[in-house]
Amino acid sequence: MFSFFPPLCTTPLLKFAYTFLLLMIYSVLGWCSEMIYCSAGQRKLCEKRGFLNGPICPIYGHGALVVLLCLDGGCKNPLLTFLLGAVLTSLVEYVTSYAMEKLFHMRWWDYSQYKFHLNGRVCLLNSTLFGLASVFLCHFANPPIALWLTDLLASGVAVPLSLILLAVYLTDIVLSVRGAVQLSGRLAKLHAIYGELSEKLEAMKAEARQIVHSKLEPLTEHGSELAARLESARAEAQQKLRALYDHQNVFERRLLHSFPTLRSIHYPEAMKKWKEYIETRKK
């Protein structure tokens, strides 16, 4: 009979330490798996993956815990573990995608280019891989890891280690969330800059048309004046863009690298132009 907690977990603190360390282990293993998978697909070492700054993807850790808890450590039939594991982990991924989109108004990943996807949040390929990972987790990986953690509990190291890791984990979450919020705010400012420039350009176009139709003033003189104003408006916009770029922090930059398909819900065009501008600054 499977029991999620070993017999040594007799207090809430010990149960927390055991659960949190499992979460950390599978989050790190998940991050390693994603790095290997993405690097193999690109045939080169890919940019660091994940929302957090550390080598960790909590979505994998939470997915592993959900599978272990809901399947009582795994079904006797590996095929059933595969099917249920695929469903459970896909549910975790879908909910995470939806929640992060609502929180930050950005689409962090999109599987629309894959066949058999659901709203671009989950796809059959990943669900199949998650199902296989669930079989490996329940029938091979978790038993020895659980034994190792039991020894760690017995040694008295598990509780202080879990508290230290919790402090680091929460700090990482705060910094990453702050970076995402700042990135969202930066896109709003970028949208305003391009909107202001567009309004000025439209006003100048209207003025130029009026001059051409009226023929009351020398066209050359007004053409030179409009060209100067246009150049001034563009220079002002470029200056604001440089200020936005110079004031972005390392956490914002990392998020853009970690999520190549990151898309803003409210400002998709601003996100596209921002990425293009960043690429031009790199050259």
Predicted features and spans:
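Aromatic-rich, lipid-facing transmembrane alpha helices and their immediate juxtamembrane interface loops
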Residues: M1-K283
